[in-house]
Amino acid sequence: MSVAWIGSQPVSLMDAIQNVAKLLVSSRCPVFTIDADVHGTRSAIALAERVGGAFDHIHGDTLAREVALFADQGAMITTPGETRRRSSLVVLVGDIPVAHHELLLHLAGSNPDLGDRNKRVWFHVEGALEPPSDAGRLHRKLRPVAIGGEGLGLSGVLAALRADLLGRNQTGSLANVDRLKSALGKSRFPVFVFSGAMNSPDLAMLQGLVADLNKQGRASSLFLPTDDDAWGTALTSLWMTGFPPRTGFSDSLPSYDPVRWDTQRMVRDKEADLHVWVSARGTMPPKGRIGLVSLSRTEKRTEGAAVTISVGRAGVDHDGVAFSSRIGTFHSLTASAPSELPSIASVLQQLALVFPGRMGLPC
């Protein structure tokens, strides 16, 4: 089976790698769009630095919004383990992605055993204007008490709830707010669960509410990212460069700008002249009018790509390391169906070795 193509022609892996090296050497503004495990991400970032490019995640817009919470607002964050062991009051805020429902169901099947040992109770702060979610099974199991107000979106409900908890006068009332107040009075460590699907004003209001509660007791929030792999890329980027994705190396030093280094925008606006698409999940790149190199988990060439290299996925084709929101940190992955597909990290390491100077990547 072919794993590399130049245009539409199958070639050896080394021929494809050498062709990619030529394209990168001749490029004046290459950009990397990444979706990989930790090893693949580290190699892609190191290569972007080597060639003076910029990098972003495939889900860059969503990830940038999630990063903004921490960069612009700050947040009080706990882990799933601390929530499971210490919190008898869990408040869901907004819609929680289906990918995290199993984690919440696992929490529902246990009770805290440290500090706060009351039976765990659930509430759900939701807006009347939210689109229907896929939370039917989750709600049947958790049976959360709904907190909301007629005609209020999530922003309005959070604002009204925060004002109510501070004892401020307001027009209208929220359903079941007295029950939540009673539960807050009994709980020693309430936790508010939210995801990156919320918008920035909602996130800021939620963190303000948590900060208010911490003036008289202890409370925190549990962040469940929209995409675990994307959040892992953000954390990997932070420890390598000091910045999240949407970072560029145009003057050799890392520079973060969520607008300037939005790689897919740069491709659309032809600010870049070469797009290196790296996808272990096999996501196809959007069509563009600049040169394209595709490192993707695919069985055929990527349409429009000057070079296509088929790569494996960590946890399926080869071992790797990835972020898991279930444990709140990175964990190792064991290949479930080992194959001969090369890993992203190994391809990029070989690519670095055929560059002028033949220096391997420092990771």
Language-model segments: which ranges?
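N-terminal juxtadomain amphipathic helix
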Residues: 1-7
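Non-catalytic alpha/beta scaffold blocks inside enzyme catalytic domains
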Residues: 67-218, 248-363
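Histidine-anchored nucleotide/phosphate-binding helix
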Residues: 19-23, 39-51, 111, 204-212
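Gly/Ser/Thr-rich loops at beta-strand to alpha-helix junctions
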Residues: 10-14, 19, 26-44, 95-99, ...
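Anionic-ligand anchoring segments at beta-strand to alpha-helix junctions in alpha/beta enzyme folds, i.e.
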Residues: 29-85, 214-253
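DNA replication sliding-clamp ring fold and its partner-interaction surfaces
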Residues: 23-27, 186-187
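Short, surface-exposed alpha-helical recognition segments that flank or form part
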Residues: 8-11, 168
